[in-house]
Amino acid sequence: MSETPAQCSIKQERISYTPPESPVPSYASSTPLHVPVPRALRMEEDSIRLPAHLRLQPIYWSRDDVAQWLKWAENEFSLRPIDSNTFEMNGKALLLLTKEDFRYRSPHSGDVLYELLQHILKQRKPRILFSPFFHPGNSIHTQPEVILHQNHEEDNCVQRTPRPSVDNVHHNPPTIELLHRSRSPITTNHRPSPDPEQRPLRSPLDNMIRRLSPAERAQGPRPHQENNHQESYPLSVSPMENNHCPASSESHPKPSSPRQESTRVIQLMPSPIMHPLILNPRHSVDFKQSRLSEDGLHREGKPINLSHREDLAYMNHIMVSVSPPEEHAMPIGRIADCRLLWDYVYQLLSDSRYENFIRWEDKESKIFRIVDPNGLARLWGNHKNRTNMTYEKMSRALRHYYKLNIIRKEPGQRLLFRFMKTPDEIMSGRTDRLEHLESQELDEQIYQEDEC
């Protein structure tokens, strides 16, 4: 039986047609859902892949790390050979260099190295994903409040059928609640109560120790009417108020127990650097708990008024002063009783804080190297109150010492110099002439700047 042309075409279409893949993923498997990383973020991370030993913050790089980074950049970006001797410094000193400093040290590749370093600094900034979609077991909100829970069982209990009361008790670990609050340990946040008659009086303590239920956390963050300041971050460490999972249905809420427990609050004072609080499970924390009731607080059978409740809130606060680690201040280069440049250079060479600017290459032979010419010029400018001092201007003063055979430039070496005399020998000579030459040089610079 012959087929009509229309039937043949329909048959061919059926054979060649393949149904498209369903855009809806299958949830039959028990594997967790992986959210793909945005393409722009993935491209930014894949654009520069440093070696494993260089993936620390550049501020922690050693001198060898800086040399290896230069070698890697030279190969990665097909740059001209870079003289690593011009970058003999650690990561801290590398971050002090400006773009002009990079160009001065490496005329052909300095701008690329500077932009590469800035890109690495941006790439090393921590990224925080605030969406709870990435962590179904945790509840992470943005600015209003951040609540971190170490236990994932509580959220899973929402979907389970209720068990007998004996099985419903779970001894969960303490929760850590990090909230944005004002300077005062007593918060002024008052959420509207569903029934004002049942809740005649709500102290700030009740709002402060209030913990979100899993059903409330699933609804996302709520808008806050309070003023969120960044100066203070109260951190409350407390046991769970309710050690049982709520019922799976929200239409039958359980009445709250008549007795609740207050929390012990550890409040971190404002500090430039916030250190993490490490809770060691081996050392138990003794929380002195006071019993609260919904219809008015009672303690030993006597009612407690509002002032006592505020005192209770203050008693349950532990003020922890978090101070940043001691860091050496950036040297500004001012040295007392030091007028001449050669003496100033000797003083800097004797101080280890200035090794990123100038250092001894061979102390016995009195050979020194200027590591950061522009930085050294800025230090000399601060010392002489010349904010526009440059290395070119400072090198003019150095040339006077060439003529007097005090300092000599090493032949064939860049930024390498040698003292031809000891400080005692220099002081025994005519220092008044040196002072006159240097002051004359500064006066000429000021005159030229005024002319411009």
From Swiss-Prot:
Site (Breakpoint for translocation to form ETV6-MDS2 in MDS): L54, R55
A GO biological-process term: mesenchymal cell apoptotic process
Keywords: Acetylation, Chromosomal rearrangement, Disease variant, DNA-binding, Isopeptide bond, Nucleus, Phosphoprotein, Proto-oncogene, Repressor, Transcription, Transcription regulation, Ubl conjugation
Result for mutant: R399C: In THC5; abrogates DNA binding; alters subcellular location; decreases transcriptional repression in a dominant-negative fashion
Region spans: Disordered: 1-30, 158-262
Cross-link type Glycyl lysine isopeptide (Lys-Gly) (interchain with G-Cter in SUMO2), residue numbers: K11, K288, K302, K403, K421
PTM comment, free text: Phosphorylation of Ser-257 by MAPK14 (p38) inhibits ETV6 transcriptional repression.
Site entry (Breakpoint for translocation to form PAX5-ETV6), positions: R55, L56
SMART domains: ETS, SAM_PNT
Main subcellular localisation: nucleus
Gene3D superfamilies found in the cross-reference section: Transcription Factor, Ets-1, Winged helix-like DNA-binding domain superfamily/Winged helix DNA-binding domain
Record-listed Phosphothreonine modification sites: T18
Keyword Acetylation (UniProt): yes
Positions where Phosphoserine occurs in the chain: S22, S213, S238, S257, S323
GO molecular function, one term: DNA-binding transcription factor activity
Cellular localization per UniProt: Nucleus
Bias (Polar residues) ranges: 1-10, 230-250
Site (Breakpoint for translocation to form ETV6-AML1 in ALL): A336, D337
Tissue/organ expression: Ubiquitous.
Signal peptide residue numbers: none
Family: Belongs to the ETS family.
PANTHER family, per the entry: ETS (PTHR11849), TRANSCRIPTION FACTOR ETV6 (PTHR11849:SF19)
Name of the protein described by the UniProt record: Transcription factor ETV6
Organism field: Homo sapiens
